[in-house]
Design a protein with these regions (language model features):
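Conserved SAM-binding strand-loop segment of SAM-dependent methyltransferases
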Residues: 41-50
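Rossmann-like dinucleotide-binding domain that binds NAD(P)(H)
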Residues: 147-217, 223, 237, 303
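Hydrophobic residues in well-ordered beta-strands that form the structural core
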Residues: 46, 85, 110-112, 141, ...
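C-terminal glycine/acidic-rich active-site capping loop/insertion
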Residues: 115, 228-300, 324-328, 335-357
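Basic phosphate/pyrophosphate-binding loop/patch that engages nucleotide-derived ligands
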Residues: 101-109, 123-137, 202, 226-230
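Beta-strand-loop-alpha-helix segment that lines the small-molecule cofactor/substrate pocket
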Residues: 59-117
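N-terminal Rossmann-like dinucleotide-binding module
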Residues: 1-39, 355
Length: 357
């Protein structure tokens, strides 16, 4: 696919020394002509099966509408190709689990494009959480809004919320247990343009997200509140992307007055940790190639993608039930993980390097 996001994948894979882009498929011939003019020598087709039949192609990137992900990924894996599929992995958890099992059976990499796992600020924040510098995490609050682009195939939660759900799981190193969600269909009859969701984790941590296509401001923020410190990430701010606040509440057994309570609020320095500046999409592409060629698994695998899709399903169910807290059933992770063991071997089909994408 070379619509809104596909050309960016073309660019980053072309920039890598260890990969070369051979084909691009899209149903729109004018889009193909445009990318071909930008990348001379690129072969194009309106039938993706043509590139799947090419033995020189070792891996494919799927950046098509979400509803098509499962079918195309299935055919690619069956053709012996490694696969990087844009988020979300697919529309249903049944499809996601089937893809995970298939990837394991054929011994091919199936990576999901949860690109914010390669964001320098999120990576640094994860390091701080794992090191215990924020203390016990009480809650997370994410906002992801903009004015458009409005999609007609999935709602704002599937489109935008997928990012935040993957970030929550990455930072907490945990699988959510329940979700409550509500949304509003404003510009289209049955597709939510704005969604609010609260996700519960096993240790009691709460994670809240607000996503919208109908907002005057582009906002990409995440606040993490811990027992020791608090963090605020703002992906739109190029200077102060990540701030660590030495603020909190020193809790004695009790307090006698409001004045005494105010004294318990602790406010100290604000720290701006050094962040490695890199393009997340380029790093994701580099990681995918490394996984294929070297057997170095990083990023979001099929199981990670499946958990996010299962959470999305539960959130939609909650919306249909007035926002009721809905269990997130992830009752077969061991089966999927076991079957997907070959994913980390980095096996390759016989062909010449560099990798053909």
């Amino acid at each position: 696919g070379c619509g809104h996001w596909g050309p960016n994948h073309l660019r980053v894979f072309n920039e890598l020394d260890r990969s070369s882009v051979l084909w691009c498929a899209d149903l729109n011939a004018s889009r193909l002509a445009k990318v071909q003019s930008r990348f001379p020598g690129l072969r194009t087709t309106t039938d993706y099966r043509s590139l799947l039949a090419d033995d020189a192609v070792e891996a494919v990137v799927i950046a098509t509408p979400t509803a098509t992900h499962a079918a195309i990924a299935r055919e690619a894996l069956q053709a012996g190709k490694h696969v990087l599929v844009e988020k979300p992995l697919c529309t249903t958890s049944v499809e996601a689990q089937e893809l995970a099992l298939l990837a394991g059976a054929v011994g091919r990499v199936l990576m999901v494009g949860h690109v914010f796992l390669f964001n320098g600020g999120i990576i640094k924040l994860r390091e701080l959480v794992v090191a215990g510098q924020l203390g016990r995490i009480h809650y997370l609050d994410a906002v992801r809004t903009n004015l458009g682009p409005v999609r007609g195939d999935v709602n704002a939660l599937y489109d935008l919320g997928t990012h935040d759900l993957s970030i929550f799981n990455y930072l907490l190193g945990s699988t959510p247990t329940a979700v409550s969600a509500q949304g509003s269909c404003i510009s289209q009859g049955a597709i939510e343009d704005v969604c609010f969701a609260t996700v519960q984790y096993p240790d009691g941590t709460l994670a809240h997200l607000h996503v919208s296509w109908l907002n005057p401001r582009k906002v990409r923020t995440l606040t993490v509140v811990g027992s020791l410190k608090m963090a605020h990430w703002d992906d739109v701010d190029p200077q102060d992307t990540l701030r660590i606040y030495d603020k909190g509440l020193d809790e004695p057994p009790y307090y006698n007055s409001f004045g005494e309570f105010q004294c318990l609020l602790r406010s100290a320095d604000v720290h701006l940790p050094a962040i490695r500046r890199m393009e997340p999409l380029l790093k994701q592409a580099e990681t995918f190639v490394g996984w294929v060629l070297d057997g170095s698994p990083e990023g979001a695998d099929a199981m990670d993608g499946w958990i996010v899709v299962r959470t999305l399903e539960a959130a939609i169910q909650s919306m249909r039930n007035g926002g009721a807290m809905t269990p997130i059933r992830v009752d077969t992770p061991a089966k999927v993980r076991t079957a997907a063991v070959p994913l980390i071997t980095g096996q390759r089909l016989p062909s010449e390097s560099p990798s053909g994408l």
